[in-house]
Regions:
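Short hydrophobic alpha-helices and adjacent helix-cap/hinge residues
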Residues: 1-181
């Protein structure tokens, strides 16, 4: 939230997500709670399901347009496997709608058209998972006895091509701390 607010006032955050993924539902709920505490509105746009009960990919650009039309200042992209696989469609729709994106995973910024994200680098996640695997395979520990914890190192990544396309450049305060791609 501080990162988004560094760009300017945040009145409303839109969120497109796949409600079939528990992590996405929980993240959307947390953002809604944060909005209540921090004084910004949120609007969630769950992906419609097709006849097979899967997210309807064809509806993805429209969900983004609805977020923009509903007055969102930002589109928050939660951790979501469906959105990650379809990140180009999602981030292109947001860019084309003039809606800046804040992503929770680096692929949306590095490998697509997302604007900015405060992310746990995949490299760091891999190191931690390797440590856990060692504890299980070499140390003989049960997976259930290992603590679940969040990583405490994050990277601020800004996609400058997207910033240029949107005409929405990072504030000077980010120049010394962000990684620009």
């Amino acid at each position: 939230l501080r990162t988004m607010r560094a760009y300017g006032p945040v009145d409303k955050v839109g969120m497109v997500y796949n409600e079939l993924e528990a992590n996405s539902r929980l993240t959307v709920q947390r953002m809604q709670a944060l909005g209540g505490v921090e004084g910004f509105a949120t609007e969630a746009f769950p992906m419609p399901l097709d006849d097979a009960g899967a997210p309807d990919l064809a509806a993805l650009p429209e969900q983004v347009r609805l977020a923009k039309a509903g007055g969102a200042d930002w589109l928050y992209i939660p951790p979501d496997s469906f959105l990650n696989v379809n990140r180009d469609i999602l981030t292109t729709a947001a860019r084309d709608a003039g809606l800046p994106t804040f992503a929770s995973a680096e692929n949306f910024i590095r490998a697509s058209h997302g604007l900015v994200g405060l992310v746990s680098r995949y490299y760091n996640v891999g190191q931690y998972v390797g440590y856990l695997a060692e504890q299980i395979l070499v140390g003989g520990r049960s997976p259930g006895e290992l603590p679940i914890r969040n990583l405490d190192r994050f990277s601020l990544i800004v996609n400058m091509t997207t910033a240029h396309d949107l005409g929405f450049y990072p504030p000077l305060s980010m120049l010394s701390i962000a990684e620009f791609v």
